[in-house]
Design a protein with these regions (language model features):
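SH3-family beta-barrel domains
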Residues: 1-13, 24-28, 35-76, 80-101, ...
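Solvent-exposed hydroxyl-ligand-binding patches built from regularly spaced Ser/Thr
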Residues: 17
Length: 128
């Protein structure tokens, strides 16, 4: 997984600046799954299954997740901990660190632990 480096990124039909723009992302830090590589371009897929080619200068190592459904941010990495915030479906959060099936994340002004059951943007056995 990689994430968008900038708040406006062109996604193209093919792996070249000469290829037409398919659509434009306007969400900095959005995580994207790399499905192919060609020279300085990466073919990506997002959490809604949109796909296309992005120049590598517009991408960086992923440290973000998207919630696939509403979930709770907890004070500690257990569901028995105090809830800090309810996070909406589609919410973008930034990863601080991951342990087992949990990641400590920043969601707006909140920092807490999120279980990785309902997220997109990380391989579950991947630790940061």
């Amino acid at each position: 997984f990689l994430m968008l480096k900038n708040s406006k990124v062109n996604v193209r039909y093919g792996p070249s600046r000469e290829d037409q723009i398919k659509f434009i992302y306007r969400k900095k830090n959005l995580p994207l799954k790399v499905t192919d590589k060609k020279e300085n371009f990466r073919k990506i897929t997002d959490h809604k299954n949109n796909s296309g080619w992005i120049h590598i200068s517009q991408l960086r190592k992923s440290k973000s997740l998207v919630l696939m459904k509403e979930d709770i941010l907890f004070k500690k990495k257990t569901k028995f901990s105090d809830p800090i915030a309810k996070l909406a479906e589609g919410k973008l959060v930034l990863i601080k660190k991951c342990q087992e099936n949990w990641c400590k994340v920043k969601a707006d002004e909140f920092i807490g632990w999120l279980e990785l059951n309902n997220v997109w943007g990380i391989e579950i056995n991947n630790s940061h």
